Amino acid sequence: MAVRSLWAGRLRVQRLLAWSAAWESKGWPLPFSTATQRTAGEDCRSEDPPDELGPPLAERALRVKAVKLEKEVQDLTVRYQRAIADCENIRRRTQRCVEDAKIFGIQSFCKDLVEVADILEKTTECISEESEPEDQKLTLEKVFRGLLLLEAKLKSVFAKHGLEKLTPIGDKYDPHEHELICHVPAGVGVQPGTVALVRQDGYKLHGRTIRLARVEVAVESQRRL
């Protein structure tokens, strides 16, 4: 075994020497020779830029980038300040609009109520303590006509502004619209759980209940044994 290994090693050495001789006969430097390493090192050094130019170029690039970033920061700061000013102006304008809406929101309603007040004033002028007995009948007729006109005007004003009167006789009891006063026995033709009597009318404004109707609700009467 040792002889075979020795023989194989000799063959390898002989082949390597023959290969080296043929390589040098052609004038080519050996791949692992000192000349080859020197030439490769010189080629690498010739391609590298001088070390003296590296730091100044990097520093200059950083300065340019810093100036650019500083300009961007200044621009963003100006935009941010303008946005804050615009938001503040919008907030003040909105607040002013809300205050005006609170003050003048019922302006139209008040204007219509003034006409109702005029009718009421003219009606009261018809009543005088110094009126003669024979004129009392005529005065009462005028007052009655004035009250009818006043009621009609109020209904017109309420309808114009979305104010709806609730008179829920016969309707099913609804705690969101009705205030229960008491229960009463259900009479003929009256269903239990429905409104039998309205003590005070309720009102809705644009579909929202602003005053509950005070009602009496019918219940099934108990049979006596």
Swiss-Prot record:
Top-level taxon: Eukaryota
Assigned keywords, A-Z: Acetylation, Chaperone, Mitochondrion, Transit peptide
A Gene Ontology molecular function term of the record: protein-folding chaperone binding
InterPro entries membership: GrpE (IPR000740), GrpE_coiled_coil (IPR013805), GrpE_head (IPR009012)
Annotated GO biological process: intracellular protein transport; protein folding; protein import into mitochondrial matrix
Keyword Acetylation in record: yes
PROSITE patterns in the record: GRPE
Modified residues (N6-acetyllysine): K142
Transit peptide: 1-32
Pfam short name (any one): GrpE
GO terms under cellular component: mitochondrial inner membrane; mitochondrion; PAM complex, Tim23 associated import motor; TIM23 mitochondrial import inner membrane translocase complex
Subcellular location: Mitochondrion matrix
This protein's record includes keyword Amino-acid biosynthesis: no
SUPFAM superfamilies xrefs: Coiled-coil domain of nucleotide exchange factor GrpE (SSF58014), Head domain of nucleotide exchange factor GrpE (SSF51064)
Function: Essential component of the PAM complex, a complex required for the translocation of transit peptide-containing proteins from the inner membrane into the mitochondrial matrix in an ATP-dependent manner. Seems to control the nucleotide-dependent binding of mitochondrial HSP70 to substrate proteins. Stimulates ATPase activity of mt-HSP70. May also serve to modulate the interconversion of oligomeric (inactive) and monomeric (active) forms of mt-HSP70.
Assembly mode: Probable component of the PAM complex at least composed of a mitochondrial HSP70 protein, GRPEL1 or GRPEL2, TIMM44, TIMM16/PAM16 and TIMM14/DNAJC19.
Family that this chain belongs to: Belongs to the GrpE family.
The protein's name in its UniProt record: GrpE protein homolog 2, mitochondrial
Organism field: Homo sapiens (Human)
